Amino acid sequence: MDPNQHNPPAGHQIVHVRGDSETDLEALFNAVMNPKNTIVPPSVPMRLRKLPDSFFTPPEPKSHSRQASTDAGTAGTVTPHHVRAHSSPASLQLGAVSPGALTSMGPANAPPQHLRQSSYEIPDDMPLPPGWEMAKTPSGQRYFLNHNDQTTTWQDPRKALLQMNQAAPASPVPVQQQNIMNPASGPLPDGWEQAITSEGEIYYINHKNKTTSWLDPRLDPRFAMNQQRISQSAPVKQGSQLPSSPQSGVMSGNNPIRLQQIHIEKERLRIKQELLRQRPQELALRNQLPTSMEQDGGTQNPVSSPGMGQDARNMTTNSSDPFLNSGTYHSRDESTDSGLSMSSYSVPRTPDDFLNSVDEMETGDTLGPGSMATQPSRFPDYLDAIPGTDVDLGTLEGESMAVEGEELMPSLQEALSSDILNDMESVLAATKIDKENFLTWL
């Protein structure tokens, strides 16, 4: 078979047409337009689908009846229960045991007590409590109906009666032992009352706020502290001072530690204030020199404006920090990516950009003879207004500063090495930069 037979040439398309495509498409439209004419395949009836009987029986409302008690029992309180579990020791419920019986097992001299009546099946001839009725499920499991509150339960109420009857004669012994072993002996606080439930559990009633509690109020540390202070104090009326005295004692004990923490916080705040106070000075020092150079390059006759030195001198004399004073000069914000960054202003080496600008100001084409005469008197005054700059003014000095220049030159010649001098010569011999291209922003 030729393989090229199934591969059409480029640019040609093969359309396959099926014989029943039109009929299938018409059938789809007819099924939507005429739904009555369509034949729906019969489905299996619900009764023949092998579903359980409970699927067809609607749930009955939860009510007090024997029919509804099989499914509508108290599911929240029912524990995993087997059919014959009520006759085994596993049916012992720890919640039904009174706290007095549990506390009686704590002391070593107390005899062990075994609740044997809950480990065997209760005979059927024993009468149920008033208002109770016993019934059986279809599977034969027994449950109990409480007509008093209209509830059903799996637990036999006769077990609680037997446990309460056995715990009743033994209850005075745990109470006496509790009074001996527990320091919470004595009368109850004012407004409290002790009571016992039907299952033998002891609880306490607070008549002041009409609440009940399982906790003995005599075990409350606040009540014990108040009783101790009342017994130790004289009959002086100090009721209003009792609640505040523990807090005052705690504060007096922690007073030196609190003072030390406050002192440390003050030191931290003082250091932060010093750093914030030094930060504007550094930023202004970094940005003032490039900003002034930009102003000199942007004006038509930069050297012939003698007011700049006077303003700078006024800024230094009017306040301790000339850069924090509000004047007519606006400094540029700090730019980390600028080519004119003065981040190395503390280095003794003279910046290259500054030397280029000085050379340009000396040999500019637009400078006249009159403006050259005013330059030595203006430029040093401007540099004097900037604190902390290590700029050599030997090349800019006039006749008035010749004595100071002679004093500085020997020390500079001794400190400079041949490498630094070669770098200075290469910088000075470089091509002059135009004023328009002097400031290059990156």
From Swiss-Prot:
Residues 238-249 have a biased composition (Low complexity). Residues 288-304, 313-329, 337-347 have a biased composition (Polar residues). Keywords: Activator, Cell junction, Cell membrane, Coiled coil, Cytoplasm, Membrane, Nucleus, Phosphoprotein, Repeat, Repressor, Tight junction, Transcription, Transcription regulation. GO terms for cellular component: bicellular tight junction; cell-cell junction; chromatin; cytoplasm; nucleus; plasma membrane. Disruption phenotype: Embryos display a small head with smaller eyes than normal and fewer cartilages in the branchial arches. Marked increase in cell death in brain. Incomplete epiboly at gastrulation, characterized by blastopore closure defects and impaired axis formation. It is found in: Cytoplasm; Nucleus; Cell junction, Tight junction; Cell membrane. The keyword Ribonucleoprotein does not apply. SMART domains: WW. One of its GO terms (biological process) is endoderm development. It comes from the Eukaryota. Expressed in the notochord, brain, eyes, branchial arches and pectoral fins. Residues 247-442 are annotated as: Transactivation domain. The keyword Repressor applies. InterPro entries: TEADIR3_omega_loop (IPR053819), WW_dom (IPR001202), WW_dom_sf (IPR036020), YAP1 (IPR051583). Phosphorylated by lats1 and lats2; leading to cytoplasmic translocation and inactivation. Gene3D superfamilies: 2.20.70.10, 6.20.430.10. Residues 126-159, 186-219 form the WW domain. One of its GO terms (molecular function) is transcription coactivator activity. Signal peptide: none annotated. Residues 51-89, 97-116, 230-254, 286-374 are annotated as: Disordered. The modification Phosphoserine is found at residues 21, 69, 87, 119. Residues 258-279 form a coiled coil. Transcriptional regulator which can act both as a coactivator and a corepressor and is the critical downstream regulatory target in the Hippo signaling pathway that plays a pivotal role in organ size control and tumor suppression by restricting proliferation and promoting apoptosis. Required for expansion of the neural plate and neural plate border zone progenitor pools. Acts as a direct regulator of pax3 expression via interaction with tead1. Plays a key role in tissue tension and 3D tissue shape by regulating cortical actomyosin network formation. Belongs to the YAP1 family. PANTHER family: TRANSCRIPTIONAL COACTIVATOR YAP1, YES-ASSOCIATED PROTEIN YAP1 FAMILY MEMBER. This is Transcriptional coactivator YAP1. It comes from Danio rerio.
